[in-house]
UniProtKB/Swiss-Prot annotation:
It catalyses: ATP + H2O = ADP + phosphate + H(+). It comes from Methanopyrus kandleri (strain AV19 / DSM 6324 / JCM 9639 / NBRC 100938). Heterodimer of an RgyrA and RgyrB subunit. The topoisomerase domain is shared between the two subunits. Keywords: ATP-binding, Cytoplasm, Isomerase, Magnesium, Metal-binding, Nucleotide-binding, Repeat, Zinc, Zinc-finger. Zn(2+) 1 binds at residues 66, 69, 85, 88. The gene is rgyB. This is Reverse gyrase subunit B.
Length: 1221
């Protein structure tokens, strides 16, 4: 039994779980026999595949595409997602396709994998172990976990969980950034149970004692229900003393399979944990565990098997990479200016490069030699992760933790027309159903009370009214804060009251879709912009960007507004790149006076870099800040004008406090983030919530509310219009009109909120499968061309997408519109036409021209683009092929349910997409084409909808193949002719001083012409070359000149050699070119080099040319000619037919003499305007095919028509008196 061999390849510990699967799949051997019966020669398989393909469908051969041998394979097999060539599986492709479909129908993904295993074991037994490891074992392990989950819960894994499982079994470490309710903790508990049963040691790290208990119970429940043998140890602060002691003893001795603790245990016991040799580390809610310090990252890595010195080396490497890019940019700036410091910076850059190489080699050796644990970081938000310390994880484990998005919103916003007061808040809380409330007090409210004081008063008032409320602010002890949040999550606390601070723990860090139902704002969230800024304000990039953004909205002058918004936008981009960039910028401008800083706005970045002794990269940012300060100072120089503009704007208010004046603007970001706590993404979609904003009938407050509504509508749009309660709002003078929401409508909205929370509860309790919600049911891989586009697409759905560093590229991950989305880029074309075999890389198979492609690459030395070779044919350098990138894309494809090819929506993009499709290899995923015409949230969302998915457009692909073949057959052939005809002559005279008189003489064969002669200069020169005049003296070309600039003197000449006297592209004859030179009258021996100009190109064949070719081909097919060759000596005429059984008319053999041949030859050589004497024309002077003009004979109009329509052979037949047709 072939499947018995598969069982032998299963890693120890898992075999008892695999055997039932193999027993269920025993019928696959019968299916395999059906395929084996169609065995035939590989060439016959390919011929059949090509011959049976519709003529309208593109067909090609792709080199380096077989997943087994790495050889070439036909697109017929590759686009059938088989991925194995005809030599490795010499069976009928159509039968194989049908049987694979049947195997999947019977046994799912694992059925396909095992069927392929049986066939590979039969035909390619030497490669079966590699095939099992890469393709079969991931599916088998996923099936194991799936069946365990089914036995324990009655549910099967859903798509994202299958992706995580496949990724884990392949030995990857990775991060999971997925919404609450998508089953991260369930999946982690499940794989922990399976790994523990197989004898692998697992460490499950969680942030709280509550989660320790939950995970412990879940793992033990899985083990009990699925009959797994798993020894679980949990440790937390709430355990009895004796239980703690026993747990510590078992941990110290390693007497467990799965260990579950909080992060506090990790902090205090890391030395004990790093001795235990874990196989898998699961970090649940990673942002909570590493919040506030990166040292927990180091501790996790130590437990994974790394030494602290190695972790520090990884951190040093991440720091050096940033330093490298900074130095590189600075060096370019110094070199451009000719600054003498360039050599010092260049030496430092070399030192940094050397250290980077050493550290990369060290870490590569560590990862190869050390048996490190796999690490999985899980998070619903990821927002609080300290990215600088996590750079260590990127260097060691090739992935990054991302951050979730805040753009998803399903909220009804309601303006409550009432003076903010505890009583007003209580009324709204009761109207909203009490439980699940978040009350936010904005900062800088009118009055003397601070926001923190109001928070405490509100909480106290609600508690005295019978509503369980807790206050949370910066002064709340961490334990009380955690207790309040846990109580809110469990339903013991009704309401949380907090400050609406953009960085508050409730505003940014609360992700409880099952608990948070509604939000109440104790006034409109706002920011204040000082209209009389201090010097330290103007040197703060955040203040300048914020002030410019808000003041720009007040301006009616479109050009001025656009200018301010442009500067503010550039500053925001700098700020968002990271704290360290802002710190460097502030450090650079700190010593400068404001006047000096503003003067830098008009200076060149290179001058700024020299003045401040910084790199050009930072100098550009300093210039941007200086420009912002100048614009802001100019605008704030007239406070009365600013106040007048604010009055006209109707969306902001001016607030005066003593001698200080402030501009109050709505804080949209804080409002969106805070209200977003009641509308969270989970496995069933986005929860519905309510947001109430208390606002008094005061014009200044209403202006701020109006600004909030308008900016929110402009920035995000809204599915629901703002409403007002308990009455309508009509302020036409400021453009604010809101429709009243009735008590009945409000009650209906509250019911909708409750229904949504019940659905969340069922998903979290396992009573409702994620698939039953219709959302997040599938994992998708989107393939685009540009890396920037890939990053932008993922960023549309996530603040900071998770990143996986691939071999040759980067993949980005995010939850997007019901899909677990991974985006990767091809970085342009991945394949191109080879030069051989066939006719310039085009084969003839079964009466069809079939192009052959191979993987593209680029020479690391000369930059030459190379196809299918690891050695550059131009310079012999090493070629960096795209094979590693394609292998990585194959790995990603093996994890996905659906693959979306999102290359550019044109013929070239279609062809790139088709090439990638062919290189996907063997995959169980469905492959579709999707298009988008704008990289916006709306554009990508449309492309991700299933109704937008389609097949690759065969017509577009065929059009691009035709264009490329035409380029090769015509353009490439013409280019080779150019290489034969044009030669490059280089004459080096060596180092010469300025003022030297030079004479150069060229003696070249007759018929060779010098079409260009010039002096070339080195790369550092601003002028790369200068034309030099040649004179003809007898048989020689002569140059006489005095050089004004000394240095290395080199001349180059372009020679036109139509008769190829100097050789061709395959070799030249330099001895035929004689060069004599003298300097200041003294002969010198120049260094002379002659070579074909192989860098010349005839260019691409454009569409009109293709049209002409198609028209001529059609005429050729529709025109019948006799094909023959005439050999004439003397009186004997021999006709040799080039087609069988050609019947040659007797008249032709009688009249085709030497004179006729001479006439025809001259017309063939000179064309229809060829002229003849009367003697040359002979007996044809009287025919209608010739006419006489000025004593000479040439073809008549009738003769020209014959020549044009029937060619020279047709004219020959007419001259012989025989019909040309």
């Amino acid at each position: 039994m072939v499947l018995k061999r598969a069982a032998d390849m299963v890693p120890k510990g898992f075999r008892d779980l695999v055997e039932p699967i193999l027993d269920d799949c025993a019928d696959l051997e019968e299916l395999a026999d059906r395929v084996v019966e169609t065995e035939m020669e590989p060439d016959e398989v390919r011929r059949r595949d090509v011959g049976n393909t519709d003529s309208n469908e593109p067909v090609a051969i792709f080199g380096s595409s077989c997943v087994l041998c790495g050889g070439d394979c036909s697109s017929v097999r590759l686009t059938s997602r088989i991925g194995i060539c005809e030599r490795c599986l010499p069976v009928d492709t159509e039968t194989l396709r049908e049987v694979l479909k049947e195997a999947r129908k019977r046994h799912g993904y694992v059925g396909e994998a095992l069927l392929m295993f049986i066939l590979v074991e039969r035909y390619s037994p030497d490669r079966v172990e590699e095939f099992f490891r890469r393709y079969v074992w991931p599916e088998l392990f996923t099936e194991i976990v799936d069946r365990v989950f089914d036995r324990a819960t009655g549910f099967r894994l859903y798509s994202a969980q299958r992706v995580w499982t496949r990724r884990l079994v392949k030995g990857c470490s990775f991060s999971i950034l997925a919404p609450t309710g998508t089953g991260k903790t369930s999946w982690g508990s499940l794989v922990a149970a399976v790994f523990g049963h197989a004898g692998r040691r697992v460490y499950y790290l969680v942030p709280t004692t509550t989660l320790v208990r939950q995970v412990e119970n879940r793992i033990k429940g899985f083990a009990r229900d699925a009959e797994l043998d798993v020894d679980v140890v949990a440790y937390h602060a709430a355990m009895p003393t004796q239980a703690k002691r026993e747990a510590l003893e078992r941990i110290s001795s390693g007497d467990f399979d799965v260990l579950i603790t909080t992060a506090q245990f990790l902090v205090h016991r890391v030395e004990d944990l790093e001795k235990l040799n874990f196989d898998l580390i699961l970090v649940d809610d990673v942002d909570a565990i590493i919040r506030g310090t990166g040292r927990n990252v180091d501790r996790v890595l130590r437990v994974a098997g790394l030494e602290q010195e190695e972790i520090d080396s990884a951190y040093r490497l991440a720091t050096l990479r940033r330093r490298y890019y900074s130095l590189r940019d600075w060096l370019r700036s110094l070199e451009d200016r000719g600054d003498k410091r360039a050599e010092r910076v260049r030496e430092e850059l070399r030192e940094v490069e050397r250290e980077i190489e050493e550290l990369e080699e060290l870490l590569k050796r560590v990862k190869k030699e050390r048996d490190l644990a796999r690490i999985v970081f899980m998070s619903a938000t990821g927002a609080a992760a300290p990215s600088r310390r996590l750079a260590v994880v990127r260097e060691l484990f090739d992935f990054e933790v991302g951050a979730g998005g805040e753009g998803l919103r399903n909220i009804q916003d309601i303006a409550v027309i009432s003076e903010p007061s505890p009583e007003a808040v209580e009324r709204i809380v009761r109207k909203a159903g009490v439980k699940g409330g978040l009350i936010f007090v904005p900062q800088r409210l009118p009055g003397e009370k601070k926001a923190r004081e109001i928070v405490e008063e509100l909480a106290e008032h609600l508690r005295s009214s019978g509503i369980e409320a807790r206050a949370i602010h910066a002064g709340t002890p961490a334990e009380e804060r955690e207790e309040a949040i846990d109580g809110f999550s469990e339903g013991d606390v009704d309401v949380l009251v907090a400050v609406a601070s953009p960085y508050g723990v409730i505003v940014r860090g609360l992700d409880l879709p099952q608990a948070a139902r509604y939000a109440v704002f104790y006034g409109v969230p706002r920011q204040r912009i000082r209209l009389t800024p201090r010097e330290e304000d103007l040197k703060d990039p955040t203040y300048v960007a914020s002030a410019l953004s808000n003041l720009a909205r007040l301006l009616d002058d479109r050009r001025a507004r656009s200018r301010l918004e442009g500067v503010a936008g550039r500053l925001w981009r700098i700020i968002r790149r990271g704290t360290w960039i802002r710190e460097r910028l502030e450090e650079a401008v700190e010593p400068l006076s404001l006047n000096t800083l503003m003067k830098l706005a008009k200076r060149d970045p290179e001058d700024i870099a020299e003045q401040l002794d910084v790199d050009r990269w930072l100098a550009r940012h300093v210039q941007t800040l200086a420009e912002g300060v100048r614009e802001l100072t100019r605008l704030l120089g007239d406070p009365d004008r600013v106040k007048a503009l604010a009055e006209e704007a109707t969306t902001v208010a001016v607030y005066e406090e003593g001698e200080e004046a402030y501009l109050e603007v709505p804080d949209l970001r804080t409002y969106i983030q805070a209200s977003g706590r009641v509308s969270r993404l989970f496995a069933g979609g986005v929860t519905f919530g309510l947001s109430f904003v208390l606002c008094p009938e005061d014009e200044r407050e209403l202006r701020t509310l109006n600004g909030l509504i308008r900016r929110m509508s402009y920035t995000y749009g809204s599915e629901f219009e703002w409403r007002s309660y308990p009455k309508s709002l009509d302020m036409k003078e400021i453009g604010l009109e809101l429709k009243e929401i009735s008590d009945e409508e409000l009650e209906e909205l509250v019911r909708k909120v409750d229904e949504d929370r019940e659905r969340v509860r069922k998903v979290l309790a396992g009573e409702l499968k994620p698939e039953e919600t219709g959302r997040l049911a599938r994992s998708a891989l989107m393939i685009v061309e540009s890396p920037n586009k890939a990053r932008m697409i993922a960023s549309l759905f996530s603040q900071r997408p998770s990143r996986r560093r691939l071999n040759g590229g980067v993949a980005y991950e995010a939850a997007a519109d019901g899909l677990h989305l991974t985006v990767v880029a091809t970085q342009g074309h991945v394949a191109d036409l080879v030069e051989e075999p066939g006719v310039h890389g085009v084969l003839r198979i079964d009466e069809r021209w079939v192009p052959m492609y191979d993987v593209l690459g680029r020479c690391s030395e000369c930059g030459e683009q190379v196809v299918g070779s690891e050695e550059c044919p131009n310079c012999g350098g090493e070629v960096e092929l795209k094979t590693p990138l394609l292998e990585s894309i194959r790995e990603l494809a093996s994890e996905a349910d659906v693959i979306l090819i999102g290359t550019d929506p044109d013929t070239e993009g279609e062809k790139i997409g088709w090439d990638v499709f062919n290189y996907l290899g063997w995959t169980t995923a469905q492959v579709y084409r999707t298009e988008f015409h704008e990289v916006t949230r709306r554009g990508i969302s449309e492309a991700l909808k299933e109704e937008s998915w389609k097949n690759v457009d065969a017509g577009r692909v065929s059009a691009q193949i035709l264009r490329r073949v035409a380029d090769r057959w015509i353009g490439f052939s013409l280019s080779q002719d150019l290489w034969d005809v044009f030669k490059h002559l280089e004459i080096k005279l060596g180092e010469l001083p300025s003022g030297s008189r030079i004479e150069v003489r060229l003696d070249i064969p007759s018929g060779v012409e010098v079409v260009d002669f010039r002096r070339t200069f080195d790369e550092d020169s601003s002028v790369r070359s200068r034309s030099v005049r040649l004179r003809r003296e007898g048989d020689e070309y002569v140059v006489r000149t005095r050089i004004s600039r000394g240095g290395d003197v080199t001349y180059t000449a372009t020679l036109l050699d139509p008769n190829r006297k100097l050789g061709d592209r395959n070799g030249v004859r330099p001895e035929l070119v004689r060069v004599r030179a003298s300097v200041n009258g003294e002969p010198v021996d120049p260094n002379v080099k002659l070579e074909p100009m192989t860098w010349l190109s005839a260019g691409r064949v454009q569409t009109p040319v293709l049209g002409w070719i198609i028209d001529r081909a059609r005429e050729y097919r529709e025109t019948e000619f006799y094909a023959c060759r005439a050999e004439v000596p003397a009186d004997d005429v021999t006709i040799r037919a080039l087609i069988e059984e050609l019947k040659v008319p007797r008249a032709l053999t009688e009249k085709l003499d030497e004179a006729t041949i001479r006439v025809l030859s001259k017309i063939a050589e000179e064309g229809p305007d060829a002229e003849f004497s009367e003697e040359e024309v002979g007996r044809f002077t009287e025919t209608e095919l010739f006419e006489r003009k000025d004593g000479r004979y040439r073809l008549s109009e009738e003769g020209r028509k014959v020549l044009e329509s029937e060619g020279v052979i047709g004219l020959m037949l007419h001259l012989a008196g025989v019909s040309g047709r």
